[in-house]
A protein has these predicted regions:
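...with weaker cross-activation on analogous glycine-rich loops/strands in unrelated enzymes
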Residues: 57-123
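Glycine- and charge-enriched low-complexity intrinsically disordered segments
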Residues: 125-140
Length: 140
């Protein structure tokens, strides 16, 4: 899967309606959010085998064990090229403290809570904790 030439426009269109959407396991959690971003940029859903398979935290763990590679990082390693988090670029997938988001250079965007507001949150790069990153490749 490769980014489309207009991937930035596609990503912005994907993010806009999600800004205030609350977290929901299996529908709008960190995995489905990051996968939706990849699909917006590339036109390919990287996790079709997970869609509709879980609706709880426990269910997500079961899905990772049954159709994934056992855990989130290993599942992503099998689907994307891992890169050092210090080299993550805009549009790449980043994990910080087990939370997946989309890199926007100096920060990542993820599903979460900021005070009383639920929806998309910003996590500055300096605050990334034990980060991992995966490249969403550019087109051929």
């Amino acid at each position: 899967m490769y980014r489309k030439p207009d991937w930035e426009t596609r990503l912005a269109a994907y993010l806009d309606p999600l800004r205030l959407r609350a977290f929901a396991w299996g529908q709008h959690d960190c995995c489905t959010f990051a996968a939706g971003a990849v699909e917006a940029m590339t036109g390919v859903d990287p996790i079709p085998e997970f869609r509709g398979r879980y609706s709880t935290a426990r269910g997500s763990v079961r899905a990772l064990r049954s159709v994934g590679r056992g855990d989130l990082a290993s599942t992503l390693d099998a689907k994307f090229e891992a890169v050092d988090a210090s080299l993550a670029q805009r549009g790449d997938i980043v994990m910080s403290s087990g939370l997946l988001g989309v890199c926007f250079g100096a920060f990542l965007i993820a599903v979460g809570r900021d005070g009383d507001r639920e929806g998309l949150i910003r996590i500055d790069r300096a605050a990334w904790d034990a980060p991992r990153a995966w490249r969403v490749r550019y087109g051929v």
